[in-house]
Amino acid sequence: MANAKPFCLLGFFCLLLQLFSIFHIGNGELEMNYYKESCPKAEEIIRQQVETLYYKHGNTAVSWLRNLFHDCVVKSCDASLLLETARGVESEQKSKRSFGMRNFKYVKIIKDALEKECPSTVSCADIVALSARDGIVMLKGPKIEMIKTGRRDSRGSYLGDVETLIPNHNDSLSSVISTFNSIGIDVEATVALLGAHSVGRVHCVNLVHRLYPTIDPTLDPSYALYLKKRCPSPTPDPNAVLYSRNDRETPMVVDNMYYKNIMAHKGLLVIDDELATDPRTAPFVAKMAADNNYFHEQFSRGVRLLSETNPLTGDQGEIRKDCRYVN
């Protein structure tokens, strides 16, 4: 009888550990090296595929970065963006906000390589996050450490929310700051993330209002003439691939040239001019224009914050076998 109480306490303690374990599994969190036991080569496979695809199709690296934003800003980093219209799901890719997005077909190449190594293990949501990280490196941007994994995939899409949650090309700076703030991203990181425009482009349909019938006075005059050559019609075909790059000097490099351009009034969008002049953001713009290392530091921080937006973890969602369809 003397030992009954200690054994009872020990049994109770073990029960608590079991309950904690169950709770932890059902309510997991993102962590570093999540696949170290279940699929040790996962991150290396993704990196290799991103590199291979980049050398065959250079613009895939830009697509991976854009995918991260479009996926994570809409509700969750859960690969809902990758779902095609099928089995009662309406694809987010149908939204006007997704105009110009491409290279979704190459996600399947990455997923197939992972499925061959570790079937039904690595989520499409983690592919979105890690391919963005590795794509940034291919674009000569920062090598971002501390990208956590363990996301799970949604079982549906949020097409009805895309128009509300993805900023429009002509949204105000205040609106964009509010959007990022709502997912836990501060102003400094927001300014840095907008630096992704360094490798972006804007279709003429979204910028001609700054050129016709009169030129926006905030635009550098010589730059405005260049844009009119790129976009010669005030009413461009909305489906035509007519565009201008944000950065003419280093269009495929994630660097601080974007900030130098907007300080010289050579930004494509209204928000570019606001970013360089608004007292909330102008100091960050000036500092990033002057210091590429500082820009890379803040850009890395912004990407980490963005990639951890409201993920599905534990027993939420699923691990899709094909990123285009729910299981």
From Swiss-Prot:
Disulfide bonds join C39-C118, C72-C77, C124-C323, C204-C231. It holds the Pfam family peroxidase. Its EC number is 1.11.1.7. Binds 1 heme b (iron(II)-protoporphyrin IX) group per subunit. Binds 2 calcium ions per subunit. GO terms for biological process: defense response to fungus; hydrogen peroxide catabolic process; response to oxidative stress; rhythmic process. The keyword Coiled coil does not apply. Ca(2+) 1 binds at D71, V74, D78, S80. This is Peroxidase 21. Belongs to the peroxidase family. Classical plant (class III) peroxidase subfamily. The gene is PER21. There are 73 peroxidase genes in A.thaliana. The keyword Transferase does not apply. It comes from Arabidopsis thaliana. Glycans are attached at N170. GO terms for molecular function: heme binding; lactoperoxidase activity; metal ion binding. The record marks R66 as: Transition state stabilizer. Substrate binds at P167. Preferentially expressed in roots and leaves, slightly in stems. Its cofactor is heme b; Ca(2+). Residues 1-28 form the signal peptide. The active site is at H70 (proton acceptor). InterPro entries: Haem_peroxidase (IPR002016), Haem_peroxidase_sf (IPR010255), Peroxidase_pln (IPR000823), Secretory_peroxidase (IPR033905). It catalyses: 2 a phenolic donor + H2O2 = 2 a phenolic radical donor + 2 H2O.
